[in-house]
Amino acid sequence: MRIAIYPGTFDPVTNGHLDILKRATEFFDEVIVAVAVDSNKTTLFSLEERIQLLETAAEELSQVKIRGFEGLTVEFARQCGANAIIRGLRAMQDFEYEFQLALMNKKLAADIETIFLMTQSEFSFISSSSIKWAASLKGNISEFVPPHVERAIYRKYHPEIDD
């Protein structure tokens, strides 16, 4: 069985993330979305909320599982029996960072490959940070995230607004 993990903070999950996830399922029997706990980042959503948002977003993808993790990505991959780490690339600046990360992961776990998937052009500018920024200013983010994620973001930033 070919198993991969797709790690990230997913704060929040975007249509770009979902595009990478759907395409990864074409290559692997099982893809585990590894929702990271990162003590260096302050997240808008708790780990449990991020997992729930992802579960709803990926409910039609039968070979996808969502799990939280803390620590080294390659160690989590080993625990899951995965032999690949999926990473999405939007632009050249993503590649430089991801390349360094892939080299470090290869040193830590030579048996685990990093697979890069390019985002579709319509998602190349989307980031969780820019979506949160726009939402905080009451901008329209409906084309960047699934509807349930949009509602959750607006509830965080603008609790006075009704669904």
From Swiss-Prot:
Chain positions recorded as ATP binding sites: T9, F10, H17, G88, L89, R90, E98, F123, S124, F125, I126, S127, S128, S129
Entry's family note: Belongs to the bacterial CoaD family.
Enzymatic reactions: (R)-4'-phosphopantetheine + ATP + H(+) = 3'-dephospho-CoA + diphosphate
Known partners and oligomeric status: Homohexamer.
Localization per Swiss-Prot or TrEMBL: Cytoplasm
Enzyme class (EC, first level): transferase
Keywords: ATP-binding, Coenzyme A biosynthesis, Cytoplasm, Magnesium, Nucleotide-binding, Nucleotidyltransferase, Transferase
Domain of life: Bacteria
InterPro entries the record matches: Cyt_trans-like, PPAT, Rossmann-like_a/b/a_fold
Gene Ontology CC annotations of this record: cytoplasm
Protein name (Swiss-Prot/TrEMBL): Phosphopantetheine adenylyltransferase
Binding site for substrate: T9, K41, T73, R87
GO molecular function: ATP binding; pantetheine-phosphate adenylyltransferase activity
